[in-house]
Amino acid sequence: MMRTLLLFDGLGGNNDTLVSALRELHARPENLAYFHGVFAALDDVLDYLGADVRDEVLPAGLPLRRWLESGFPPDALRNSIVAGVCVHAHQVCHLQPTGRGANEAVVAALGHSIGLQAAIVAGLRPRRVDEFLALAASSLKLVALSLVRGHQSAGGTGANPELVSRYLERDSRGRTPGPMASLTGMSRHDLHGAMRRYNESGRSVSLSLVNSPTVQVLSGSTTDLLDFYFANEVVFEQSRVTWSFLSNTIPFHSSHLAPAALRVRDDLAFIGPVPGPESLAMPVYATDAPRDLRRSTDLVDEFLNQVLVRPIEWEAAAAHAIGDAGIERVVDCGPGPGARRFTRECLRANGSNPRFESIEQFSRRAR
């Protein structure tokens, strides 16, 4: 039996294949009860928020059942609330007690950014279907409300139209600027220096994710990120640094979202009971430092702080998870390829070489 780690992607899983993958899962008869619970939980969340908040943060609504049965509106997944809900629903569907969640080869879980909550669900390993469905509902409510509160807290991260137009003249891909941007090819030392000089002017750009030795992500207001880009444009060009705005509408892993993490605590009575770390049946690893969450004090606090506020140190997290749990196989639970790609690059730098396979491959073998 190969010691197996379940790996969950973050909002990088919001790609062209997410909708088709979610629609395929929804069409399977064995997932009927699960999706019934998903739709009911989302209806409860929307009722809880009220019409004014719904219109503010979800202008297209979130009728997931109708979208899966007929079609998603254009750009629906550009809203990070919608994207995060879809990513989480996709990931947790694979953890039902009759499927991979019950496989004894699985000995640990690790989630990139918002994928942490799916990793926690995997680690709790409910054995009965009713327990799983109750956990899935509370987990989806936690994720959805965290995204809503994050969106509300980030209300001031809009962009200066002149800076946006100036940037789009340079970006051949035409990706709309937002509150997170990825840099590839710049050393951490040089990036810290550039950020320090920029932030001394009273602006606020923060390093939110160190995904691999070559890929880092910044968070801040869209205007600040654009201004930072133009302040360093010549250096980026000379050093062949690639800059790319992410499709996120929320600046994850930054101090901008500290108020959101606090606000979700006020929503917990609605969210319902969430098991504590003593209920984890296997290691679930943190992403801010080499830690096993079985030794934490509160899984909700861990999710809120690690996803909304604290930066990710993926190389340290991935290396610790693989070594600590003696992992021989990593199962990529998707829905996107980002977590797998970053993990492979980080482990290559550390000399580790576990086998990687997709959740679909693992699923076929488990039947």
Q: Model segments located where?
A:
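Acyltransferase/transacylase module recognition
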Residues: 1-106, 266-269, 273-367
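Short, function-defining helix-loop hinge/capping sites that tune catalysis or transport
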Residues: 18, 121-123, 261, 342
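Surface-exposed, active-site-proximal loop segments in enzymatic domains
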Residues: 73, 118, 122-125
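Alpha/beta catalytic cores of group-transfer enzymes, especially the acyltransferase/condensing modules
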Residues: 123-298
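Gly/Ala-rich beta-loop-alpha elbow adjacent to hydrolase catalytic centers
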Residues: 91, 107-115, 119
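Gly/Ser/Thr-rich loops at beta-strand to alpha-helix junctions
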Residues: 12-13, 114-117, 222, 250-253, ...
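Short beta-strand segments
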Residues: 7-9, 113, 184, 208-210, ...
